[in-house]
């Protein structure tokens, strides 16, 4: 089980992991309504190395990416939930729309993305040049069919959105 850390704390942890020869994996996202697809994705990310760091979009960046009605859960709640997962070693907040700055600072050996970004027909990966510049690798993690936060929200809205 991990913990929520500041960037300064993560810098110290990264130095320790380097000394120990541990392979650091990074993934990032909004993780607004945590679901089994997120869990399986994070478990697959952890399997790519020794230490999993999750970059969590802060509330302002989630609003910029997903719209004014999001996030449903606050950054503090989302971070605590992620840190409570056995496969997650550290959670750090970031505010940029893409993780280039975070990746350039942490320099993880592996950057994990969803398979929807995989070439040749995947979405663009703006941070690919950053990862290549420090010698990291990008791994594509299969998505879990039928599991998404947007799908969950649509299901709730379709059910009338009433409290349960």
Predicted regions and their residues:
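Nucleotidyltransferase catalytic core that binds NTPs
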Residues: 1-164
């Amino acid at each position: 089980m991990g913990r929520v850390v500041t960037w300064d704390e993560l810098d110290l942890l990264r130095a320790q992991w380097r000394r120990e020869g541990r392979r650091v994996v990074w993934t990032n996202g909004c993780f607004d309504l945590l679901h089994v697809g997120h869990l399986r994705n994070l478990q697959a990310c952890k399997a790519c190395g020794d230490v999993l760091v999750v970059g969590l979009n802060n509330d302002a960046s989630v609003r910029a990416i997903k719209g004014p009605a999001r996030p449903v859960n606050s950054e503090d709640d989302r971070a605590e939930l992620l840190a409570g997962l056995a496969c997650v070693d550290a959670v750090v907040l970031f505010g940029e729309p893409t993780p280039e700055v975070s990746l350039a600072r942490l320099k993880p050996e592996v950057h994990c993305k969803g398979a929807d970004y995989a070439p040749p027909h995947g979405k663009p990966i703006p941070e690919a040049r950053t990862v290549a510049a420090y010698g990291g690798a990008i791994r594509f993690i299969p998505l879990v069919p039928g599991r998404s936060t947007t799908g969950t929200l649509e299901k709730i809205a379709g059910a009338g959105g009433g409290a349960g």
